[in-house]
Regions:
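Intrinsically disordered, low-complexity polar regions and short flexible loop motifs
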Residues: 1-395
Length: 395
């Protein structure tokens, strides 16, 4: 239940026979069966069932992949490869020694979307997986060096990449118990920075005392996503006019491969904070994803209403008693909403008097919307929203 994209279940045994296999989409306010197939399961056979394709272009389908139950020979690893990336063309897949020249090698397989290899056994050891468009030497995915352990029995599926980086695919590697993503070796991490301190001047953001990530960012502005190498960083937030004036010194952050983050400078200039939030920018064709973050110390504890008409007198808040915290910013997470017209109203906790009222918002399926509540620009002013993602996207 609740299986997200690029997630695989463990492998389990069932009796032979014919089974009705269905996939139910979890939609805002409702569920609907979107895929169904009758599959006959035979003895001594492995079945891996993929949901592949695209909801947006109505190409969603079930893809059963089979293999004969085969023990892994001692000293070997066993692999089955599936092309499950609907957005990728027919490709050549190379599995070579890490230092092999691609021009000297032959592809293990040429595969179009939905193709799968048989089980392939290779000596355990270090390998490199590279993918090119069929007939081309232009590498669009490079795993770098990966280790195939003695006795490993792996299902490797090329899936559409929805993380950071330029590769069109991410490999999903399943061992029968769990699954992990194998990113292209050149995949970065994405980070954007939000200036949410109303009484602070324009700032520069510097990583590891040398890398200027952001220059002259003023309140209440935000950057676009910046691609950086995955690593541990120490972040300084300094005055743009004089970098010797340090507001935030050596804030430790870890940026992981393929992930996206929002760093929010918040609180007040006398006690500045830097919070790092992990983002989930993958778009879902059947819903609008909405996220609200509380970064306004002046607002205190708030109630957040999401309604169809802006009237809150007789309704309960969608999120009640949301506090501003210097430990970790409170947020709603990504809330799935059906496409349509909405009004977001923020009040002091227990009050029906609006501190923030967005007015009418038209939210579209397949879009992501983020709003950050921060202090008003002037002392005593009401809180305001910094809008990100598709709230401010250019049509």
């Amino acid at each position: 239940e609740g299986v997200d994209y690029q997630v695989a279940s463990g492998r389990f045994e069932v009796e032979t026979g014919t089974y009705d296999i269905g996939v139910t989409a979890i939609l805002p306010g409702d569920n609907a069966e979107v895929l169904q197939a009758d599959v006959t399961l035979e003895a001594d056979t492995n079945y891996d069932v993929f949901a592949v394709g695209s909801v947006a272009d109505d190409s969603l389908m079930l893809l059963p992949v089979t293999s004969t139950e085969t023990s892994v020979t001692a000293g070997n690893a066993q692999v089955q490869i599936v092309h499950a990336a609907s957005a990728a063309p027919t490709v050549d897949i190379y599995v070579t020694a890490p230092d092999a020249m691609l021009a000297d090698e032959q592809p293990l397989v040429t595969a179009e979307f939905t193709d799968a290899t048989d089980l392939v056994q290779v000596p355990a050891g270090e390998y490199r997986i590279r993918i090119t468009p069929a007939g081309s030497m232009d590498v669009v995915f490079d795993s770098g060096t990966v280790a195939l352990a003695d006795g490993a029995d792996l299902l490797v599926a090329a899936t559409n990449n929805t993380g950071s980086g330029d590769s069109p695919v991410t490999l999903l590697v399943a061992d029968g118990e769990s699954a992990v993503k194998l990113w292209d070796a050149n995949t970065t991490a994405d980070i954007r920075v939000v200036h949410g301190i109303s009484d602070a001047p324009a700032v520069d953001v510097i990583a590891n005392n040398e890398l200027v990530l952001v220059d002259a960012l003023a309140f209440p502005m935000a950057t676009d996503y910046l691609s950086v190498m995955p690593a541990n960083y120490l972040i300084d937030v300094v005055a743009d006019a004089d970098n010797s004036i340090v507001a935030i010194d050596d804030a430790a952050v870890t940026l992981e491969t393929g992930m996206s983050y929002t760093a929010i400078a918040n609180n007040e200039l006398a006690a500045p904070e830097l919070d790092l939030l992990m983002d989930m920018p993958r778009r879902v064709a059947t819903e609008a994803k909405v996220r609200i973050i509380h970064a306004s110390p002046a607002a205190g504890s708030v109630d957040i209403y999401v309604t169809g008409d802006g009237e809150i007198a007789d309704v309960d808040p969608a999120f009640a008693g949301v506090d501003y915290s210097t430990d970790a910013l409170a947020e709603t997470g990504y809330v799935s909403l059906a496409a349509g017209e909405y009004f977001v109203t923020v009040t002091a906790a227990g009050s029906k008097e609006a501190a923030i009222a967005t007015g009418s918002l038209m939210l579209d399926a397949g879009n992501v919307y983020t709003a950050i509540a921060v202090n008003g620009a002037m002392e005593g002013a009401l809180p305001q929203l910094i809008l990100l993602d598709d709230f401010v996207a250019t049509p």
